Amino acid sequence: MCGIIGIVGSAGGETVAERLVDGLRRMEYRGYDSAGICTLHNGALVRRRAEGKLANLAAVLAGDPAPGFVGIAHTRWATHGAPTAANAHPHATGEVAI
């Protein structure tokens, strides 16, 4: 089972990355193997992912923030592929994130 949350904020307001991680934390349960977020900043997708628990994603974001006022966050329950940061959701390429 995965946890997914999306936030649409206001330009000029606070960025959504911290709120996205908090939203995943509120839905947190045992069993997921990785987590990630993807935000929209100046027309470009900004993605951060980590293997393991949400604390690992928070550590990634502390060192490499994900600016933006719109975003999605996702925890992954592995049904295929190894539990790695590369397999963590969301996946993104170009202008598309899923």
PLM regions with names:
Residues M1-I98:
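N-terminal glutamine amidotransferase
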